[in-house]
Amino acid sequence: QKPKQVIKRINDYYLNSNANVHRGAHQLSAEATEEFENARLSIKNYIKAYSEKEIIFTRNATEAINIAAKSWGEKNLQENDEILLSIMEHHSNIVPWQIVAEKNKCKVKFAKITNDGILDIEDFKNKLNQRTKIVSLVHISNTLGCCNPIKEITQLAKNNGSLVLLDACQSLAHTEVDVKDLNIDFLAGSGHKLCGPTGIGFLWSREEILDKMPPLFGGGEMIQDVFEEKSTWADLPHKFEAGTPAIAEAIGLSEALKYINRLGLNNIQKYEKELTEYL
């Protein structure tokens, strides 16, 4: 179930501030836009991103990974390049890469896990090579419960010249995730794993990477100008957010992050440890 604060906040939006964002000149639209963009800022602060412009709202983490795979992957992956995953990945972090690999004629490789159910670092090292253009891994596995050594993995990847995408769905509500400290390049998160509503997620990447990525969806809001011959794109983050966004859901996610911050991640970890020891 969801925290009462989250439900109340969504209800308040629909009762008092219900309007589309970035489109209207009237007061309700201005209020909704402010609340929506404050939600983006709250995610930026939560993951310690460089700028709120780096936060792309999506329907879920699956869509976030698909945007990275299709927009960045199709543009940057060449024939015989490699994408390195682990065998513990969620299907959402496998299938998008398989699709782009088939289209761009590159390969998807999988690092093994040990008998203890953790990432086999030696196998990972063996499969990381000059053809590996991106490493995409889960932070905490939703099936095995293990926490991957992301800083060690990122260092290996960076030394190899590879980018790193982190599926942080399971970790964001349980441990601190600092994108700068982890030195990653992409992060995918989902609202419903953060005590927030369904139908909202986000993709983070550094501004210099996002600037070079083409938009995946076309329509309202993501354009700057539309001509008969061509169109030009809006600035970040809006060039990746076509159409009316999930406004209430974004505002609800922002309230959920406030709820987690009030509880404190250290207190959450302590309580989870006590539960584990009790079991």
Provide a role label for each language-model segment.
Residues 1-279:
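Pyridoxal 5′-phosphate
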